[in-house]
Regions:
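Acidic, S/T/G-rich, low-cysteine, solvent-exposed domains in lumenal/extracellular/periplasmic regions
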Residues: 1-175
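Short, aromatic-rich amphipathic segments at membrane interfaces
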Residues: 144, 151, 178-203
Length: 225
């Protein structure tokens, strides 16, 4: 299941989610932690990748998932005990949900905005009779399927989608459905906003200052000779 933010009420969709123990948080998530967003845009989330069967390869390789314009996902208060809900992607403790999206004047946290952290991807399973099982994966932003977003994280978004499908389609013998793909696109290096700021300052200020000092030292040495 994939959803996208809308200002309209979606009662039927909400009832389906709540039947499986989850619901969406009002608004769009913004990050205050510069290690969890890119492009100087707090809505371009780099969520934490939680460790589970779906994310094992991605988390072990310290990959990034990029999810712009995501809504928060939270569990309902009294979901039935036959449901198992695992977190796939979560935001940082500094994240918050901007409630008044249509009239948003600032990206700063305001009164009425909802404190994080939030889930932005969950895996839900439920054991049924006759050894059958319901399996659902839910992500709260359709941008996960966007080619440009996928390229910005070197294909990690599509790998997550493939792993999610594999988890839901796995057979009793443990085999999975897998379609490998090769891309001719140039890989993109994804750097969190905090790291980007550091390297910008380093390249634009520290390196030139070092070269000036080094050049001055060489000039003084030659002058004395």
């Amino acid at each position: 299941i994939v959803s996208n933010y809308t200002g309209e009420e979606m009662d039927n969709f909400a009832s389906v989610l709540e039947n499986y123990g989850v619901k969406t948080v009002n608004g769009i998530i913004l990050e205050a932690d510069t290690n969890h967003y890119i492009s100087q845009n707090p809505s371009y989330l780099l969520p934490n990748i939680e460790s589970n069967d779906i994310t094992s390869n991605l988390s072990s390789q310290s990959r990034y998932i990029l999810m712009p314009l995501a809504q928060g996902i939270e569990t309902t208060d009294n979901y039935r005990d036959t449901l198992t809900i695992q977190n796939i992607l979560t935001t940082s403790d500094s994240s918050y949900s901007k409630v008044n999206v249509e009239n948003m004047q600032t990206m700063e946290k305001e009164s009425g905005d909802i404190d994080g952290p939030f889930h932005v991807g969950v895996a839900i399973s439920e054991d049924l009779e006759d050894d059958k099982q319901t399996q659902i994966v839910y992500y709260s932003s359709e941008t996960l399927f966007n080619d440009n977003m996928n390229t910005m994280v070197s294909g990690a978004n599509f790998e997550l989608i493939s792993a999610s499908v594999n988890w839901m389609c796995s057979n009793e013998d443990g085999s999975t459905i897998s379609i490998s793909s090769k891309s001719l696109d140039t890989s993109t290096l994804t750097i969190p906003a905090a790291d980007a700021s550091f390297w910008s300052i380093f390249v634009m200020a520290v390196v030139p200052a070092f070269l000036v000092i080094l050049g001055g030292g060489i000039w003084m040495k030659r002058r004395k000779q």
